[in-house]
């Protein structure tokens, strides 16, 4: 019965960061650090603060997600890492070195260590897949033999060996993004910045690209910083996430923790599309008080991930007594933690509504009596 009721999503979770540090010992120290970072722009309406007092550390080898509403400062933040944006105040440290002190030559070398992929691919339409990937190496003066070896390796990594003579117009969106990823890796970077890299792709292609990014992170030990408005992308691939609002950090933590128990209103709003809303049909029938003796108590149970095991639904239903009906919901695993929500209707129990809620609290981290239905 439990298997039939419980919906579990196999999210192909990214390997635990602890596991990756065994393969890459250098992962146990902070790679990128923002210290009191601020960025302002002069606009027609006056000075606009894009970033305010950002203090944040990203561990080497981590897949780190950045989310927030439009204009929250996400792109401004990651563009300070390769110095495409000059901070107004504060510092950006990479491997404990303040990059604000770099001269032009050191900045060029830094930018080669930082790959970047974009929403709109930015491929050259008149060049083939091979030529698009090769171009940064050509510009850098890399000898032809080395260029060919590197391009061949990268096209194999992203699965485009058979498309090396194709032009961008002949590629799907996912294939174009794979070219973009290959091009971003030509200089063997140790940081990869992803700015809405999957937002122009369909769900199936998004999964494919995320799988590729996971593989790159695992094999190469890259630090990946990922901006997205798609919360499912954060859930799928990231180790930790930070939420920005008006240029400030309003929440951060492990993905399972933020998703399971969002504290800030912005986080709650952004996560709302992933939550199970109360069905309209149920809302129309819900009553504050029971209208008859055979009315069912409607309970909402939330699992926030503080315990790693999935709830034993058979034991839960038996403890509630009476006839228990699952109205909606499911439980999924994120980073090894069980998260989700169940809506239950309980009829014919010897327990009253408050007693049912307390009993359900032995299995769920949050329980609520929503009302009664007949």
Curated annotation (Swiss-Prot):
UniProt GO MF annotations: ABC-type D-methionine transporter activity; ATP binding; ATP hydrolysis activity
SMART domains the UniProt entry points to: AAA, NIL
Species this chain originates from: Pseudomonas fluorescens (strain Pf0-1)
Topology versus the membrane: Peripheral membrane protein
Top-level enzyme category: translocase
Record's keyword terms, sorted: Amino-acid transport, ATP-binding, Cell inner membrane, Cell membrane, Membrane, Nucleotide-binding, Translocase, Transport
Location within or outside the cell: Cell inner membrane
Keyword check for ATP-binding: yes
Role: Part of the ABC transporter complex MetNIQ involved in methionine import. Responsible for energy coupling to the transport system.
Main location as per UniProt: membrane
Chain positions recorded as ATP binding sites: 68-75
Superkingdom of the organism of origin: Bacteria
Signal peptide: none
InterPro entries, A to Z: AAA+_ATPase, ABC_transporter-like_ATP-bd, ABC_transporter-like_CS, ACT-like_dom_sf, MetN_ABC, MetN_ABC_transporter-like, NIL_domain, P-loop_NTPase
UniProt key word Cell inner membrane: yes
Family statement: Belongs to the ABC transporter superfamily. Methionine importer (TC 3.A.1.24) family.
UniProt name for this protein: Methionine import ATP-binding protein MetN 2
């Amino acid at each position: 019965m439990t298997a039939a009721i419980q919906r579990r999503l196999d999210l192909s979770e990214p390997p635990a960061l602890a596991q990756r540090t065994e393969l890459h010992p250098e992962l146990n120290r902070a790679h990128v650090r923002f210290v009191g970072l601020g960025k302002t722009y002069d606009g027609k309406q006056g000075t606009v603060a894009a970033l305010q007092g950002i203090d944040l550390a990203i561990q080497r080898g981590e897949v780190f997600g950045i989310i927030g509403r439009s204009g929250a400062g996400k792109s401004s933040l990651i563009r300070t890492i390769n110095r495409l944006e000059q901070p107004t105040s504060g510092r950006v440290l990479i491997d404990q070195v303040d990059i604000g002190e770099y001269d032009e030559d050191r900045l060029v070398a830094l930018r080669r260590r930082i790959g970047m992929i974009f929403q709109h691919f930015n491929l050259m339409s008149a060049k083939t897949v091979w030529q698009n990937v090769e171009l940064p190496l050509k510009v850098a003066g890399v000898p032809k033999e080395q260029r060919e070896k590197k391009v061949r390796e990268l096209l194999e990594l992203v699965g485009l060996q058979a498309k090396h003579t194709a032009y961008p117009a002949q590629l799907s969106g996912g294939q174009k993004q794979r070219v973009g990823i290959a091009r971003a890796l030509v200089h063997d970077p140790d940081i990869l910045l992803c700015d809405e890299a999957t937002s122009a792709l369909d769900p199936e292609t998004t999964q494919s690209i995320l799988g590729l990014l996971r593989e790159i992170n695992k094999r190469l030990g890259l630090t990946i910083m990922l901006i997205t408005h798609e919360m499912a992308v954060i859930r799928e691939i990231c180790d930790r996430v930070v939420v920005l609002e008006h240029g400030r950090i309003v929440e951060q933590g492990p993905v399972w923790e933020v998703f399971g128990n969002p504290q800030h209103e912005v986080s709650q709003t952004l996560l709302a599309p992933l939550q199970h809303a109360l069905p309209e049909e149920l809302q129309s029938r819900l009553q504050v008080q029971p209208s008859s003796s055979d009315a069912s108590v409607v309970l909402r149970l939330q699992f926030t991930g503080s315990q790693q095991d999935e709830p034993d639904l058979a034991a839960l239903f038996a403890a509630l007594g009476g006839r228990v009906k699952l109205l909606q919901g499911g439980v999924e695993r994120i980073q090894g933690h069980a998260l989700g929500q169940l809506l239950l209707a309980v009829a014919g129990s010897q327990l009253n509504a408050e007693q049912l809620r307390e009993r359900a609290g032995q299995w769920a981290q949050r329980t609520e009596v929503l009302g009664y239905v007949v």
